[in-house]
Amino acid sequence: MIQISDTAQTHFRKLIEREGVPGMGVRLSAVDPGTPRADARLEFAEPTDLLGDEWAVDCDGFTLYVDAGSVGWLDGAEIDIVAGSAGTQQLTIKAPRIKGEAPGDAASLVERVHWVVENEINPQLASHGGKVAVQEVSAEGVVLLRFGGGCQGCGMADVTLKQGIEKTLMGRVPGVTAVRDATDHDSGHAPYIPRGNAA
């Protein structure tokens, strides 16, 4: 089920009234669902834009149409308007299932490590233009990683590995015993913090 707050409903109703198109609603869909790049898209939908297989959610003064192929990914989503900086208001969509479900305990150690790296660690590293790839996961639970982008050659890579990545993997993935760096940091072209410049 999708929850849309009264504040968000009022916001959309006012926007739709301004458009003045009879029967206009709002369509919600998942973009790249089940991947780390997954996102939710909201857009106006005129009656002629609809395919007919959308799920309809009756709201105050309009209908929210959920793309049929997106329903499973958007189950449990919450749409709201929250206070932003400097007194502004910001539309938020929280869709806890949109990036997929974490592999269960029955999944292999390799699958669980890959999921955490792709869905939790790499999105954080991307803010610095970096990424990390899993090179190997040994039978003993040792994870061998290779840094890339702004993390390759970065003077803070050791700190990121020990205080960020290793801590996250060992805390979130039972069976991980250690995390090691297999990166050739000397060949990094655009490190976030060049080696020797780290504090």
Curated annotation (Swiss-Prot):
One of its GO terms (biological process) is protein maturation. Keywords: 4Fe-4S, Iron, Iron-sulfur, Metal-binding. It comes from Stenotrophomonas maltophilia (strain K279a). The keyword Iron applies. InterPro entries: Fe/S_biogenesis_protein_NfuA (IPR017726), FSCA_dom_sf (IPR034904), HesB-like_dom_sf (IPR035903), NIF_FeS_clus_asmbl_NifU_C (IPR001075). Binds 1 [4Fe-4S] cluster per subunit. The cluster is presumably bound at the interface of two monomers. It comes from the Bacteria. Its cofactor is [4Fe-4S] cluster. HAMAP family: Fe_S_biogen_NfuA. GO terms for molecular function: 4 iron, 4 sulfur cluster binding; iron ion binding. Belongs to the NfuA family. Transmembrane segments: none annotated. This is Fe/S biogenesis protein NfuA. The gene is nfuA. [4Fe-4S] cluster binds at C151, C154. Homodimer. Involved in iron-sulfur cluster biogenesis. Binds a 4Fe-4S cluster, can transfer this cluster to apoproteins, and thereby intervenes in the maturation of Fe/S proteins. Could also act as a scaffold/chaperone for damaged Fe/S proteins.
